[in-house]
Amino acid sequence: MLLPKRVKHRKQMKGRMTGKPCRGISLSFGEFGLQATECGWLDSRQIEAARIAMTRYIKRGGKIWIRIFPDKPLTSKPAETRMGKGKGSPDSWVAVIKPGTILYEMEGVSEEVAREALRLAAHKLPVSTKFITRSENHEA
């Protein structure tokens, strides 16, 4: 599972997911990619589940890049605890996703295999996504 080695502050504010991303919107490594079309939080477990789904489908062919990293701590209070008495302890890590962010990239496989592998990965994620290729990506 992905998580930062160390952080400056243990707890963070919720923040807002408005606007467009300023980086990570074009394919940088692979031929095919999975691009988010809405905003949301991706948990480190969801990122890992999607990665496993892709690697199991493509078996030993191709290469996969994970373009997002969960660096925002989510806190939670214990069950049956009264309100107040401070913020809860860090529980899990999430990556903040904005529309247009590239989540995964892939190369070394045919387009049909990549499309199916990324479709399986998209089912594991809580945000809607679309399949993109380097030829239709305007930045490349």
UniProtKB/Swiss-Prot annotation:
Keywords: Ribonucleoprotein, Ribosomal protein, RNA-binding, rRNA-binding, tRNA-binding. It comes from the Bacteria. The keyword Transcription does not apply. One of its GO terms (biological process) is translation. The keyword DNA-binding does not apply. GO terms for cellular component: cytosolic large ribosomal subunit. InterPro entries: Ribosomal_uL16, Ribosomal_uL16_bact-type, Ribosomal_uL16_CS, Ribosomal_uL16_dom, Ribosomal_uL16_sf. GO terms for molecular function: rRNA binding; structural constituent of ribosome; tRNA binding. Part of the 50S ribosomal subunit. Belongs to the universal ribosomal protein uL16 family. Binds 23S rRNA and is also seen to make contacts with the A and possibly P site tRNAs. This is Large ribosomal subunit protein uL16. It comes from Pelobacter propionicus (strain DSM 2379 / NBRC 103807 / OttBd1).
